[in-house]
Design a protein with these regions (language model features):
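Zn-dependent metallo-beta-lactamase
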Residues: 1-56, 60-63, 235-239, 261, ...
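Active-site metal-binding loops of divalent metal-dependent hydrolases
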Residues: 2, 50-52, 95, 118, ...
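Core dinuclear metal-dependent hydrolase active-site scaffold
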Residues: 36-40, 46, 55, 154-186
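Metallo-beta-lactamase
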Residues: 56, 68-82, 86, 116-170, 176-254, ...
């Protein structure tokens, strides 16, 4: 039995370029999607990331949220014949403002899965205010409810299975506790890689401000070293057939290169390239 990640679109946000691409077009504003991933075909439906709480909360980072009625997570799930209560597991690549904002819509018998180091890091103040209080307080409440949260210790244990065909591993990038979610598909391994990659065109394909052969460009929003970020991207390009970031369309990878771009289902219809993102006045 093969699994298929689907993309429920959870909205858009306007991001200052420096955050997404280190040193590139500083001060310009770029509109980016905020995706979640619904994994179907396994023993239980699994959701990866829940988007941001509402448009207003994005203003705390000076960003504009663009979340409409059709983007609401319950409406996106309904497109697949599912209710909030049908989701058995929510896996979080990390807990930033645009990734864990809807957990409180789900019942406590939906288990939220995250790397323990990410929970620790979220309350350290190091990347405040990217971890908003309402989102983190809800996760604290889940700690005291039976089976409502599952902590992984990926830096120590290595990969941990969630359901057959789906497992998590430490990302080693973006935040200190970020994790990747790996899915077995009929055409190879798909890796939901959070914010390790923001933009394939700038970071991988076009090598913006990068001179060395096979050298990826890191984002401008990370807690660790640039070498660590580069190594984490190289690991993704070396090990997986499909890469699914949260803020760009999925890509098919061969020989560490992007050979195609996919739409809302992986595996699925593919185009060779995608145009660069649109820019807006700051």
């Amino acid at each position: 039995m093969w699994l298929a990640p689907e993309i429920p679109s959870e909205g858009w946000t306007n991001m200052v370029s420096e955050a997404g691409h280190n040193g590139h077009e500083c001060g310009r504003v770029r509109r980016v999607p905020v995706y979640g991933f619904l994994i179907l075909g396994g023993t239980h439906p699994v959701l990866v990331d829940t988007g941001y709480r509402d448009n207003a909360i994005m203003e705390s980072l000076g960003m504009r949220g663009l979340q409409f009625h059709e983007n609401m997570i319950e409406n996106q799930l309904a497109r697949h014949g599912l209710k909030l209560s049908d989701i058995r597991y929510i896996c979080h690549t990390h807990l930033h403002i645009d990734h864990a904002g809807k957990d409180d819509k789900f019942p406590m018998n939906t288990t939220v899965v995250l790397n323990r180091r990410e929970m620790e890091f979220s309350v350290s103040g190091i990347m405040y205010p990217q971890y908003p209080k309402p989102d983190i307080m809800h996760l604290v409440e889940r700690i005291y409810e039976p089976e409502a949260i599952r902590f992984l210790d990926l830096e120590i244990t290595g990969a941990e299975e969630i359901i057959p065909g789906v497992w998590c591993e430490a990302a080693g990038a973006h935040t200190e506790g970020s994790m990747n979610v790996i899915v077995e598909t009929a055409e190879g391994l798909a890796c939901i890689c959070g914010d390790v990659i923001y933009d394939f065109n700038d970071q991988i394909v076009n090598h913006v401000y990068t001179n060395n052969h096979m050298e990826p460009r890191v984002t401008g929003n990370h807690a660790g070293s640039k070498r660590g970020e580069k190594a984490a991207i190289k690991k993704l390009l070396n090990n997986y057939k499909f890469l699914l970031p949260i803020h760009d369309r999925p890509a098919k990878i061969e020989n560490q290169q992007v050979v195609g771009r996919l739409n809302m289902t992986v595996p699925g219809p593919m185009t060779e390239t995608l145009p660069e993102r649109h820019w807006f006045a700051a």
